[in-house]
Amino acid sequence: DLDKSGVIDPGEFKVDDHGDLSIIGNQQARYRFGINLAANWNGIGLSVFLQGVGKRDWYPGSDAGYFWGKYGRPFFSFIPAIHDYTDDMYDPEKNNWDTAYWPRITSYQSNGTNNWTKVLEVPNTRYIQNAAYVRVKNIQVDYSFNRNVCDKLHLQGLKLYLTAENPFCYTPLHKYAPNFDPEGLSYDTDFASAAQGYTYPILKTFTFGINVTF
């Protein structure tokens, strides 16, 4: 009861009458960074490019099925391993109300009609996700053969390399939203944009090649 009115409600959804609603989180990406690392030793080369965002909050859209799972629409039960509900879901037999992250399973709790009758339809601090991340955008390992080998092969230069694009991404987001890519998140401003998490993730690419100089 933030407004001390004795009733928990959203007021008139206006700036001057917002009831118990308050601003939570910040979905803007802050502290963007990039790091280039490179090293060479005895013909062996290694280069790594890291990129990421130091701070960003994200709240799942009301119809983000890959986050809410069965708490949204019941047919999401056909999609395996959305969540492991066994330990983090409230169970009256375990009486784990103080440690469970998820409430008791009931369908259509996240995608309500904005009338405050559903448990999960009102954004709250409990389910704000940490969408900061660091991604290995590019990593390359190469080996340049020495002059003796090149001379025997009548070459000016010979190098083997293996390159990986987007091979790894670390983000706290994947604790409860493993199917989401932090770079592909959108903003849930209305129900038209609420169905999040259905875009293809950034692809991983691996390339092996040979550079030959005659």
Question: Language-model segments: what does each one mean?
Answer:
Residues 5, 9:
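Acidic carboxylate motifs that coordinate Ca2+ or other divalent cations, activating on Asp/Glu
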Residues 31-33, 42-44, 132, 154-158, ...:
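Outer-envelope beta-barrel architecture signal
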Residues 34-36, 138-142, 207-209:
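Membrane-embedded beta-strand positions in outer-membrane beta-barrel channels/transporters
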Residues 41-43, 52-56, 138, 145, ...:
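Transmembrane beta-strands of outer-membrane beta-barrel pores
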Residues 43-47, 148-149:
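Repeated loop/turn-to-beta-strand initiation elements of outer-membrane beta-barrel proteins
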Residues 48, 160-162, 210:
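Membrane-embedded beta-strand positions of outer-membrane beta-barrel proteins
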Residues 55-159:
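Extracytoplasmic gating/loop element in the C-terminal half of outer-membrane beta-barrel translocons
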Residues 71, 89-92, 169-214:
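C-terminal beta-signal and terminal closure region of outer-membrane beta-barrel proteins
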